[in-house]
């Protein structure tokens, strides 16, 4: 039950960042930090920075992360910052993933870059 609650709170915080409720999302992130949910905390922080348009800070913070599931978020930062070479390199790394969701993301980003 506790895990399920943590997941729900993380989802609420992410929705909050999308609705510019950054203080509230940060409070949830602090609580999740106390519960040892560091990946969720980092995702909430990245989302908050990105939703405020601070892609450079999000990328800088995210590049310090050890969670591979955050890589697509960093690719989005590179895309928004116009860092074509870094984005291409990241997409090439992500393309080696066996995760079909990552493959879908990579294919979608590559299509986006063609337009």
From Swiss-Prot:
Source superkingdom: Bacteria
Gene3D superfamilies: Tetratricopeptide repeat domain
Keywords for the protein's UniProt record, in alphabetical order: Cytoplasm, Plasmid, Virulence
Claim: Cytoplasm is one of the keywords in the record: yes
Changes seen on gene knockout: The yscFG double mutant is unable to secrete the Yop proteins upon thermal induction in a Ca(2+)-deprived medium.
Swiss-Prot/TrEMBL induction comment: At 37 degrees Celsius in the absence of calcium. Belongs to an operon involved in the translocation of Yop proteins across the bacterial membranes or in the specific control of this function.
Main location: cytoplasm
Keyword Cytoplasm annotated: yes
InterPro entries according to UniProt: T3SS_YscG_PscG, TPR-like_helical_dom_sf
Purpose of the protein: Chaperone of the type III secretion system (T3SS), also called injectisome, which is used to inject bacterial effector proteins into eukaryotic host cells. Along with YscE, prevents premature polymerization of the YscF/SctF needle protein within the cytoplasm. Required for Yop secretion.
Subunit structure: Component of the heterodimeric YscE-YscG chaperone. The YscE-YscG chaperone forms a stable ternary complex with YscF/SctF.
Similarity section: Belongs to the YscG family.
Family matches, as NCBIfam families: type_III_yscG (TIGR02508)
Name this protein carries in UniProt: Type 3 secretion system chaperone YscG
Gene it is expressed from: yscG
